[in-house]
Amino acid sequence: IVTGLVGSEMCIRDRLTVLITPNSFADTLLISGTIYTADDANTKVEAVVIKDGRFTFVGDLAAAQSKAGQDHKHLALGAATAYPGFIEGHGHLSSLGEAITNLDLNGVDSYQTIVGMVADAAAKASPGQVIKGRGWHQSKWSKEPSVTVDGFPTHRSLSEVSPNNPVFLGHANGHTALVNQAAMDALNLTYNTPTPDGGIIVKDGKGDPTGILHENAVDLAYPLIALSTDSAKTAILAAQDHAFRWGITNFHDAGAGSTDIEAQRALDASGDLKLRIYTMVSAQDDVLTDYWLARPPVIAGDDSRLTIRSFKAVMDGALGSRTAWLHQPYTDDPGTSGVQTFDENRLVDIMNRSNAHGWQINTHAIGDKANTVVLDAIDKATLTQRDHRSRIEHSQHLLPSDIGRFSKLGVIASIQAIHMSSDRPWAIDRLGIERIKSGAYVWRDLLDAGVHIANGTDVPVEPINPIANFYASVARKTLKGLPDDGYEIGQKLSRHETLKSMTLWNAYAAFEEAEVGSISVGKRADMTVTDQNLMTVDENKILATKPVMTVIGGEIVYQAMSVSYTHLRAHETRNY
């Protein structure tokens, strides 16, 4: 008997929480509705049957009911639509958790507003307490600060409103930070502090630090912002909850340090980790890298959600700070071609040593020169003697001649479509129209060349919102719907390609396509449900779509929809 739930939304959620906890399920769960499998045939089905955390049937409703037998719970989706669980293909897990509790500077349209936010925080903070924030981007401000050096603000205004509290404000790109005088005093950062390799300490005309740190120079501020293991655990759990609300079932954590890894392993051991995590060990830490290279990867089993089987190196910076490494100088700053942040010989060495235990090597490269150098390293190393699935994280700006090399060398292009929506309006200033047209965000060219792609958001550089990422992939517009026809529309992805790029292709990029990524018999029962059908809704309505249910291993970990269901048992019918 199908019973609709009534009452306030909170009452609905409270009651559903009681009824749909794993212990209240029959051993078998049947879910019916519009379901896209994202398998090789782009199949759409009516129902799935889940038992012991895996799909045991995928197909039409009548056959599903027969397969489920007389003792099962039936969850009907109604007007909602289901897909394989969305996989975040590239993000920063603990940084997301921190961003939730720190000053959120995303979307703030002026430096003066940021100064005001810091002033408010300083008024509430205890003396010496570090004020942290993230998300500012000078190219997105409506007006330029009154004082700038190299196009960036200085610490002066922050130091005036927060003289007794160190301030650390991370750039949206994660490659630049702004600190105030109290922070520099705590760090003993002065005019004669040596610039680290692969980093930049921006200084004014007198030689004094302005508070802006680029690339490896950001590490100088690490003592101010380093998390304890307990703090990292808190951040990861906050990020996990946030991810569930956006329909994320799996998360590729791009560059975890020792503290993050320790926290992840502790949460996994305690059972508090529900999100599936694919961890990339930070190759920026030589000691950590050498430790893990000498050991086999950690692969999640039935009682685990954590896999550690890859490394992440960082070859260059970001376009916004003009630290992405280019073959030719920046169009709007001919005095620089960006920054190399990792030694290519060290990268080749890591790649060669990775063969002993089958580690995957993933390397951040945004600029075309950085991408060329990483491809060269893969070509020099012995990786291609095995199924290495090396990834270039971002693969954002490429020489046309390098596109075919991705396919030839078996390299995965790990893109973040949402970066195109956010950055394309001003990226043309950095690169000029010719480089934009020939090599920027060239997803279609990569696919046509036979390159495997993965797709993520780079959260918290961008919000984790997979709906916005889907829209960016298929529309190639800003989130305001501009321009009307989209940017370089020949590079668009289809909706089926986009769905796969967020599910099956991301699973492939983590060697997990046999376990997750599509709704297929035998795979883990991970699903994301949205209130609208992403595959058919008008393009201009995609961004209004909301995730309403997240299922991991057959367990509903997030629910924001009213559902109808029945519980069928032999010789017994119950109303709920």
Model-assigned labels for residue ranges:
Residues 7, 127, 521-524:
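Short, flexible surface segments
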Residues 90-92, 364, 394, 567, ...:
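Histidine-centered divalent metal-coordination motifs
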